[in-house]
Design a protein with these regions (language model features):
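Rossmann-fold NAD(P)-dependent oxidoreductase module
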Residues: 30, 34, 117, 178
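A generic structural signal for alpha->beta connector loops
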Residues: 39, 95, 125-126, 142
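Active-site-adjacent mobile loop/cap segments within catalytic or ligand-binding domains
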Residues: 75, 89, 126-185
Length: 185
């Protein structure tokens, strides 16, 4: 379970000043707790507000991404799920969306399953799982990996929800169900 950004890298800053790194970590912690209650072993790439990799090594962002990939490839989980929040210049844009590596059939299947699970949070969400061939994490991991963008911090209504503990629990429940469906099917 990868909680995107952290430390000096806040990720997106919401219209409500929420930092993506904090929202990601809160949701990831909730997912971890739910999966462990079901007897699953969960490896987190980060469990606190930090960047990964060697802070003395120059471009921290590159080293952070390499460290995340290394953790995933070393532990070789059945699947990897990276938690993120989206942003766009048009504040009307909203909805959770799942990305997968365009050359991964297993990733596509997982992303579609997860996108379906996210409908339990917002039935009006019309977004579809989307292929991507440029995201470093998707390209470099050796296991099926998806990125779950839980919503848009640039949308005032969604930013308020994403920083609300009850909504985060609802999102974590949906993602947990999605992970279980992905791995068990």
């Amino acid at each position: 379970l990868d909680s995107g950004h952290g430390g000096d890298d806040p990720g997106k800053i919401g219209v409500n000043q929420a930092k993506e790194k904090d929202v990601n970590l809160e949701i990831a912690r909730k997912i971890k707790k739910r999966l462990e209650k079901k007897g699953w072993e969960v490896v987190m790439t980060r469990e606190k507000d930090e960047m990964l990799g060697d802070p003395q090594a120059g471009n921290n962002k590159i080293h952070d991404m390499k460290a995340r990939v290394e953790i995933i490839n070393k532990t070789m989980p059945q699947a990897a799920v990276s938690i993120h929040q989206n942003s766009y210049q048009d504040e009307q844009i909203r909805g959770a969306q799942v990305f997968y590596y365009s050359h991964s059939e297993e990733g596509k299947r997982m992303a579609e399953q997860m996108q379906k699970a996210l409908l339990t949070v917002d039935e009006t969400n019309t977004r579809q799982a989307k292929a991507n061939d440029t995201y470093y994490l998707l390209k470099r991991t050796e296991v099926p990996t998806i990125i779950v963008e839980c919503g848009f911090l640039s949308n005032p209504e969604e930013a308020a929800k994403l920083t609300d503990a009850k909504y985060q629990k609802k999102m974590a429940d949906a993602i947990t169900k999605g992970i279980i469906a992905c791995v068990e099917n």
